[in-house]
Amino acid sequence: MKIYNTLSGKLEKFVPLENGKVKMYVCGITPQSEPHIGHAMSYINFDVIRRYLTYKGYRVKYIQNFTDIDDKIIAKANAQGIEPSTLAERNIGVFLDAMAALNITPADYYPRATQEVPKIIEMVSGLIEKGYAYAVGGSVYLRVQKVDGYGKLSHRTLEQMMAGARVEIDEEKEYPMDFALWKATKPGEPSWESPWGLGRPGWHIECSAMSLRYLGEQIDIHGGGQDLIFPHHENEIAQSECFSGVKPFVKYWLHNGLLKLGEEKMSKSLGNLVTIKEALSRYSADALRIFVLSSSYRNPLTYSEEALEAAEKGAERLRQTAARKDNPQFKETAVDTKAYRERFTQYMDNDFNTSAALATIFDLSRELNRIEGEAGKSTDGQKLFKELADILGLSLIVAESKTGTDVAPFIELLIELRKDLRVAKQYQLADKIRTSLDTAGILLEDSAGGTVWKVKK
């Protein structure tokens, strides 16, 4: 299997650090608002990569963080007259609902930056002790000029970075490109005690600390959008390798292309968002997956209603194949399942070529439909069809869940328990209730007014 490594700029044979195991970290959202389909694109792609690695026999440990303290979260919370933590938790709930609705496998852990401050302070202190960072005015900065190979991920020198960036003049810094590991407190902002006074973590150090805590000093795959290559991921490498002394921090860097609306990237700052909730009100989760997977994960993707309508039609064709009932009167007909499986794995082994893998599933669907039209059936072909569809995360469910109303009191009790756990900041247990209910076909939806549940379709 070969994957494209942003660090080397070429396809490389995939050999994990430890035989049979894969440690995978994917940058999560900053929960300042509802998730949009740009997020769906990213997490669908990494979900499929994770599913395929699992299919190949690897034991994948998958971590995805929440940057739940940030300048934008603080500004939005202040504008709404609520605590930043309240805003972040509300949007985290909406995000997890959206991921469940998209049939995205839950992460093994969803660490929150605000819950990892002790580890962050430990890393910042260690970087100061080693001479890579300095404290001034209650803030702490990393000395990028001391970092060996700084710029190796984005393939740029410090001079090129300076020329291509709007560098704010800050008299505190020793060098303009030095970046904050710890920010001194400001009036009205959340803050934590530290050796440098009250303050809060810088963005980049949060992911370094969380990946170190949950995955160790080295990881196999680090994923994220191409807009995170610089400065975020470049700075993660600098911090992590300087702190641990172990190289490489990440063996394979994978970056997905960005979703566009017309000629512009879809983003909060541009205000051209289509939320996942809006998209799912018009199209099925399978249609969104087909839309995303019809292109390489590294390519940009342009959102259009026409493309999604075509994806929905494709999803419906696949659903009809998946829903086919066995007819004992039909003659068993051979399908070359080995050839289909080999095609599928050959494509996926080539940097997760989901477009060609998806085409293989459609070809198999057409053959199964042709066989049925000739009063035949293929038990093995039907089984392989569902297996390959599952690797791409396609549920292809036609019928509604038959969950009855008699379970309502039990579900309401679990919702109350989850609420109490969140108040007690037992977020991992609260998330486990959500994901367990999702597995059982119950979707939770959080809002300012509370939590409601519904049966997934």
From Swiss-Prot:
Source organism: Dehalococcoides mccartyi (strain CBDB1)
UniProt-listed InterPro entries: Cys-tRNA-ligase, Cys-tRNA-synt_Ia_DALR, Cys-tRNA/MSH_ligase, Rossmann-like_a/b/a_fold, tRNA-synt_1_cat_dom, tRNAsynth_Ia_anticodon-bd
Keyword RNA-binding: no
Entry's EC annotation: 6.1.1.16
Positions of disulphide bridges: none
Motif 'HIGH' region mapped to chain: 29-39
Residues binding ATP, per UniProt: 268
Cofactor(s), names only, from the UniProt record: Zn(2+)
Similarity comment text for this entry: Belongs to the class-I aminoacyl-tRNA synthetase family.
Gene Ontology cellular component terms for the protein in this record: cytosol
Comment on bound cofactor: Binds 1 zinc ion per subunit.
Matching Gene3D superfamilies: Cysteine-tRNA ligase, C-terminal anti-codon recognition domain (1.20.120.1910), HUPs (3.40.50.620)
Binding positions for Zn(2+) per the UniProt entry: 27, 207, 232, 236
CDD domains per UniProt: CysRS_core
A GO term for molecular function: cysteine-tRNA ligase activity
GO biological process: cysteinyl-tRNA aminoacylation
Localization in the cell: Cytoplasm
NCBIfam families (alphabetical): cysS (TIGR00435)
Domain of life: Bacteria
Protein name, per record: Cysteine--tRNA ligase
Major location category of this protein: cytoplasm
Extent of the signal sequence: none
Keyword match Transmembrane: no
